[in-house]
From Swiss-Prot:
First-listed, main subcellular location of the protein, grouped into a coarse class: membrane
Designated gene of the protein: uppP
Lineage: Bacteria, Bacillati, Cyanobacteriota, Cyanophyceae, Synechococcales
Enzyme class: hydrolase
Name used for this protein in its record: Undecaprenyl-diphosphatase
Protein's job: Catalyzes the dephosphorylation of undecaprenyl diphosphate (UPP). Confers resistance to bacitracin.
Organism: Prochlorococcus marinus (strain MIT 9215)
GO annotations of cellular component type: plasma membrane
Length: 266
């Protein structure tokens, strides 16, 4: 039974981390509805690592292929160096905001902002923001021709995802679309930008819950990690294919329903 719980958490994390519907909100709400324990900091850190590994594996060509390129292929090398710089710039806001929250609001996890009411309202507000993004004129900006101000702006919105119900992928994809990005590349950049953000969150969780790892055991954590890794790969692949010919409408509807259902059950 314990392993089934870890598999469930891994599935929820893997699927909802990349679909624009908020992984934190779903982990919290589904735990309450099913009457099972909160995943805890150690498990959260482990399954988040599974999502990072999935990003690295899925985009391994984008991440690693610039290494060892010949000096003749300057354009290819510059593109990937530029992409790395963009990811770095886009990560700055969440480091500043996340670090400040951890230092000055240490009980943030128990704050009213993480209540069911807050999650429901944020989910509905995010549905409206995603609607604005989906209704905006379809742009042509992509990973090859974006500028660093785009990276910082998307990173700024990513920082707001520390509030449960926002959805890191939802707010970064939406902000990119409003800025004029092409849909598929908006999702791709969102996922790549998630590598340092999710990794930093996992590291912080690990530091503050180191002793929990020994009480849970290696094998259950490995099960959660692998489940997250595999479900994350499915979610990434699905969303990139889906965005080739579709927008955010289905997720907007889902987020409204999700928020309303929570409100009706308060």
């Amino acid at each position: 039974m314990e392993y089934l719980r870890f598999i469930l958490y891994g599935l929820i994390q893997g699927l909802t981390e990349f679909l624009p519907i908020s992984s934190t909100a779903h982990l919290k709400i589904i735990s309450i509805f099913l009457g099972i324990d909160d995943p805890g900091s150690s498990l959260s850190a482990t399954i988040q690592l599974g999502s990072v590994l999935a990003i690295v594996w899925y985009f391994r060509n984008d991440i690693f292929n610039f290494r060892g390129q010949s000096s003749k292929n300057i354009l290819y090398y510059f593109l990937h160096e530029r992409l790395l710089r963009s990811i770095f710039i886009g990560t700055i806001p969440i480091v500043l905001l996340g670090g400040s929250v951890k230092l000055f609001v240490p009980n943030f996890i128990d704050n009213v902002l993480r209540s069911n009411l807050s999650i429901a309202l944020v989910s509905i507000v995010m549905a409206f923001f995603m609607y604005l993004a989906d209704s905006s004129k379809r742009g042509s900006i992509d990973i090859k021709n974006h500028n660093y101000s785009d990276s910082f702006l998307i990173g700024f919105f990513q920082a707001l995802a520390i509030f449960p119900g926002v959805s890191r992928s939802g707010i970064t994809i939406s902000s990119a679309l409003i800025s004029g990005w092409e849909r598929r590349d908006a999702a791709k950049f969102s996922f790549l930008l998630g590598m340092p953000a999710i990794s930093l969150a996992a590291i912080v969780e690990f530091i503050f819950s180191f002793n929990e790892f020994f009480s849970i055991g290696f094998l259950p954590l490995l099960v959660g990690l692998m489940t997250t890794f595999l479900s994350s790969l499915l979610a990434i692949d699905f969303l990139l294919r889906y965005f080739s010919s579709n927008g955010l409408k289905i997720f907007i509807i889902y987020r409204v329903i999700f928020g309303v259902v929570i409100l009706l059950n308060l």
